[in-house]
Amino acid sequence: MASLYEMVWRFLHALLYLQRAIVAWFRVHIWRWKLAVVDLLLPLALGFHNQKKTGPKGTRTSRRVRWGADGRTLEKLPLHVGLLVTEEEIHYTDIANLVVWCMAVGISYVSVYDNQGVFKRNNSRLMEEILKQQQELLGMGSSKYSVEILKNGTNKQEHQVLSCQSMVKVLSPDDGRLSIVQAAQQLCRAVEQKEKTSKDINVSVLDSLLKESKNIPDPDLVLKFGTVQSTLGFLPWHIRLTEIISMPSHIDASYDDLYDALQRFAGCEQRLGK
C-alpha cells in the first residue's frame, strides 16, 4: 500500500510540474504573439512605407532622436536600471539591445545579473555584443553613447570606448552575499582594533560601506525577466527601495517593452515606508 501511495504522489507531483511548465510556455508565447501583432500593425499605422525611403542611415538617426526624446519626456528617469534574468536560456543579443536602449534614453548605469553567474563568466562576450548592437542600432551616432564595464570592487574599467557616458556592471550572487560579509568583517576588525565601538555600528555605517564596494548608486528600477517570483539574490541590501517590474522574458524584448516599463516607473510614487 505504501508503494501505491508513493506512485500516486509521484504522479501528482509530475502532473503539477507539467502544468506549471505548460502555463509558463503559454505565457511567454502569448506575449510573443501579441508583440508580433503589434509589429505587424504598427508600421502600417505610422506609414512605414515612407520611412523606407530614408534608408538604414536615416532610420538609425530617426530612432536615435526618438529614443533620446523619449527619455527627456519622462517625468522621472532612473539613474540606475538593473536587468535581472531569471530564465535558464540566455540571449546575449537581446540583453545587449536592452543595454543600448537604456543608454539611448539617458540612463547612466545598467547592471546585468543572472543567478548562475553566466554573464559574469562571459563578460567579454557581453561587451562585444553591446558594442555590436550599439553600432547596429545607433549607427554613426554611437560614439555619443560610450559604455564601459566596471570591475567589481575597483574604480578601474575592463573595457572603455572613448569618453564614458554609461556604465555597465555585470553581477552574480556573490556580489550580493560577499559584499555584506566583507563589510561586516571590516566593521568587526575596526571594533577589534578599537577604531570603532559597537555603538558606532548602525545601518547607515553598513550602508556606506556597501555603497563604496559597488562604485555605482543603488538601482532605482529592476526589470525582472522570467516567471520566477524571486530576485534570486540580486543585491539584497541595495534594492530595499527599488521599484521592481516583472516582464515575461528578455528574449525578443522590444524597445517599446522597455519604454513601457520606464513609463510605469515614472508614474510610481515612492512612499519610503510611509
Swiss-Prot record:
Protein name from the UniProt record: Dehydrodolichyl diphosphate synthase complex subunit nus1
Function: With DHDDS, forms the dehydrodolichyl diphosphate synthase (DDS) complex, an essential component of the dolichol monophosphate (Dol-P) biosynthetic machinery. Adds multiple copies of isopentenyl pyrophosphate (IPP) to farnesyl pyrophosphate (FPP) to produce dehydrodolichyl diphosphate (Dedol-PP), a precursor of dolichol which is utilized as a sugar carrier in protein glycosylation in the endoplasmic reticulum (ER). Regulates the glycosylation and stability of nascent NPC2, thereby promoting trafficking of LDL-derived cholesterol.
A GO biological-process term: dolichol biosynthetic process
Functional pathway: Protein modification; protein glycosylation
Names of the cofactor(s): Mg(2+)
Signal peptide residues on this chain, from the entry's feature table: none
GO cellular component: dehydrodolichyl diphosphate synthase complex; endoplasmic reticulum membrane
PANTHER family from the UniProt entry: DEHYDRODOLICHYL DIPHOSPHATE SYNTHASE COMPLEX SUBUNIT NUS1
GO function term, MF aspect, one: ditrans,polycis-polyprenyl diphosphate synthase [(2E,6E)-farnesyl diphosphate specific] activity
Keywords: Endoplasmic reticulum, Glycoprotein, Magnesium, Membrane, Receptor, Transferase, Transmembrane, Transmembrane helix
Subunit structure and binding partners: The active dehydrodolichyl diphosphate synthase complex is a heterotetramer composed of a dimer of heterodimer of dhdds and nus1.
Lineage: Eukaryota, Metazoa, Chordata, Craniata, Vertebrata
EC identifiers of the protein: 2.5.1.87
Catalytic reaction annotation: n isopentenyl diphosphate + (2E,6E)-farnesyl diphosphate = a di-trans,poly-cis-polyprenyl diphosphate + n diphosphate
Pfam family membership, one: Prenyltransf
Annotated membrane topology: Multi-pass membrane protein
Other remarks on this protein: Nus1 seems to exist in two topological orientations, a minor glycosylated species with its C-terminus oriented towards the lumen regulating NPC2 stability, and a major fraction oriented with its C-terminus directed towards the cytosol where it regulates cis-IPTase activity.
TM spans (from-to): 1-23, 33-49, 95-113
Main location: endoplasmic reticulum
Compartmental location: Endoplasmic reticulum membrane
Glycosylation sites per record: 122
Source organism: Danio rerio
Family as reported in the entry's similarity comment: Belongs to the UPP synthase family.
